Amino acid sequence: MLAPLLLLLLAVPLWQAAELRLGLRGSPRGTVSPAFLSLTLDASLAREPRFITLLSNPKLHTLARGLSPGFLRFGGTSTDFLIFDPHKDSTLEEKILSELQADFSQPGFAAVQELLLAQWPGQEKLLLTEHSRKKHKNTTITGHTLDILHGFANCSGFHLVFGLNALLRRHGREWDSSNAGQLLGYCARRGYNLSWELGNEPNSFKKKSGIYIDGSQLGRDFIHLRRLLSQHPLYRHAKLYGPDVGQPRKHTQRLLRSSAAADSAEQKHYFYADHLSSPNLTSRLFLPLPHDTAQIVAATVPGKKVWLGETSSAYGGGAPQLSNTYLAGFMWLDKLGLAARQGIDVVMRQVFFGAGSYHLVDASFEPLPDYWLSLLYKRLVGTRVLEASVAGADARRLRVYLHCTNPQHPKYREGDVTLFALNLYNVSQSLQLPKQLWSKQVDQYLLLPHGKESILSRRVQLNGRLLQMVDKETLPTLHEAALAPGSALGLPAFSYGFYVIRNAKAIACI
């Protein structure tokens, strides 16, 4: 089913070396949040709450810490089917984990996790089947569920954004906040510093549950939630994010106007395709991100930021044999570049770990190509966005983006810039730096697929070295390859990589 995609990539002409045009002298094009690349956990992970305990795995903590700081959004369709019951008994697995953690005996939980991992494929199949059939059931979560979620986020260097159930209604209209009040009370008593959302994709409520809620009503519900938060000193100034929409609808403006006093950022959910690797995927691989949401927000509530609150290569769990391969990295890296260029403040990757094919970490806690790509992005790319373009090549097939280098990186200094580039040609391409940079040292971080599967590989190498964890608590060193001053930047066919230009003296980066 991927054949049309591969044919599209191959059917391109040979072009000569491209000349880079880099905006080093002016002001930055824009600035994004330090948490620009953030993560999600789908609420379906709590569909059977005992599987939440998988988040206690130390290897998963190590992998998450590598991508911090950021937001960790716990949301998705299942958000609106979660019921909090402070009196319900926790699952056996949650109780065991709690007791072992109290005794500082984390290794003792390993046997329980092995059993859960053996049962996970069946649970994953159930979740994907329910999603495809649009059959959603209420799930009860307990205080232990919240403890594990908050503990995972906190220990990994992330700020948890928790989605509250918006489908609890009085007479099908006004939001019933009683359950949310219980959940907020529990979190406040535990001292959990969280941010909040209300509902997931309200534009699809009718399809999911048969309940239609117009934008004005949902806006009033946001105001209601803000008042509820204000009853707790800990949450008086907590961030409330939303609304998050799958597609802009006519009621979006009404919702924004009604909730303007409550929300901190409007969220857009964006995927390139559905979960099937259909021929239509070829024409949708590199579509520009939609401007309509940003335009609506700017016109309705100026100053509010826009997030991509849930995004990946394909919705519905991802596209099998695509979303978890090197090939998906083209879509992910390009989306990061486009989003920053278009002023999106935060991009939340669906998902870090969970059901489907679009996760960054698989069911064996092994990092996939998009994880390593995300790790490099976090290490090398800063928040200031600069201008970049190419001359002498088709910009749709040779894509370049430029940022100030991450100032937290120990090897780099103010004035350094990070270029990341994607080559969709079937031949190698060379990028020529502007003449004023020919004397500068450039560090290359070239990502290529590893193994005979080529671009459909689930393993990746950096500058020729296979990327893999040293052990469950240690990420590998990301070794650069220093290029000789004046060298062209080489990109093999169907590849992507990062290039740090040292001492570029970019004015916006000083």
List the predicted regions and their residue ranges.
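Non-catalytic accessory regions flanking glycosidase/transglycosidase catalytic cores in CAZymes
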Residues: 2-264, 291, 297-309, 313-510
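Substrate-binding/catalytic cleft of secreted carbohydrate-active enzymes
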Residues: 207-213, 268-290
